């Protein structure tokens, strides 16, 4: 347990049930090469919602959570920092105040789609499906995407 002010600002953690985060669990279960990683998932409560943080392990080298404000990003960072399964923890703040702030763990994610899918531990079939559906669309697209929700 941290013994300095971060403890007071940290977002609450929970062990969400598959029912509580059913859409997230279903999404990850359909894509992860090792769905057993969901057993170590942690829920982070942000503005009344529970965000599912899936740890690194096996072929999954890293992950992230996306939040809407800098304050939420700092609270999530403070909550997950130092937890097992969340190595090399860091914040990535967007140039735009209210969008696309992420809390990342593991090595920096690759830029290339297939490599990024492997970085997040997705099954080859999930990566192939993503590449088929998004071929040519992602190059230079000016949208705020969530790499973990793409493949």
Model-derived features with residue positions:
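A conserved ligand/cofactor-binding region detector
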Residues: 1-109, 115, 124-151
């Amino acid at each position: 347990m941290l013994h300095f002010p971060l403890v007071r600002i940290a977002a609450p953690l929970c062990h969400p049930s598959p029912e509580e985060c059913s859409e997230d669990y279903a999404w990850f279960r359909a894509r992860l090469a090792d769905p057993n990683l969901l057993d170590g998932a942690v829920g982070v409560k942000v503005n009344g919602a529970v965000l599912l943080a899936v740890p690194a392990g096996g072929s999954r080298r890293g992950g992230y959570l996306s939040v809407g404000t800098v304050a939420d990003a700092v609270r999530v960072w403070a909550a997950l920092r130092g937890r097992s399964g969340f190595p090399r923890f860091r914040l990535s703040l967007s140039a735009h105040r209210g969008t696309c702030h992420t809390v990342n763990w593991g090595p920096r994610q690759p830029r290339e789609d297939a490599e990024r899918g492997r970085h997040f531990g997705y099954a080859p079939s999930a990566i192939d499906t993503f590449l088929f559906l998004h071929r040519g669309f992602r190059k230079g697209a000016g949208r705020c995407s969530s790499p973990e929700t793409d493949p």
